[in-house]
Swiss-Prot record:
It is an enzyme of class 2 (transferase). It is found in: Cytoplasm. This is Leucyl/phenylalanyl-tRNA--protein transferase. The keyword Transferase applies. It comes from the Bacteria. It comes from Ralstonia pickettii (strain 12J). The gene is aat.
Amino acid sequence: MIAWLDPHDPFPPVDRALGPESEAPGLLAASAELSPQRLLIAYRQGIFPWYAQGQPVLWWSTDPRMVLRPEDFRVSTTFRKTLRRVLDDPAWEIRIDHAFRETMVACATTARPGQHGTWITEDVIQAYTALHRRGYAHSVETWHAGQRVGGLYGVALGRMFYGESMFAHRTDASKIALAALCAFLGGQGVAMIDCQQETEHLASLGGAPVPRAAFLAHVREAASAPAIVPWHFDKSVLRRWTVRNEQA
């Protein structure tokens, strides 16, 4: 039995989340509302929302937790060639926070194999856009010839980044944005990107599961660190990161 949260109710302890033997491992609580303040409280406690359209807001704390350390991002030989083209061709741009809401909409509407519908409803977009206006939510966008062709968004607290979703309208466009994010965050002292749930795709990019207790210990320290200011990106950041990756 999970807890139902009224607007001012605190989250239950995360060790009350449903266990691996249940049909919904990691499910902790449900609520009717998704406010910006509730989101900030959740992320600081290692809790994230994920639900289908028409359901109440479902709150999760999975164990283990999928994370990506920026230095562990895997760059294949083929993708390394792609990054070189992006770096050398001025038609390719990496922008941060240029089109946050539009990036969320693209994440919601881009078709994905095996996925029907989206949890990124208009209410979700409004809540995260409010966080963006307050400096907590950010987008990393891949542009080509003036067109946004891929990107991702997530939430930053201190030196902790919580990835939410990504999209691509061109091959590797979301992967380029993720590489740029890793390059930027690595340079800012961010040691861990929260990827929430384990998938084969994330594992192929270098993501790995960690025990929830270890994840929460890291969140408590990293999320209380000074915020990253400013969020600014140019290709030199990605170029230096790519060179270091080649030498590793």
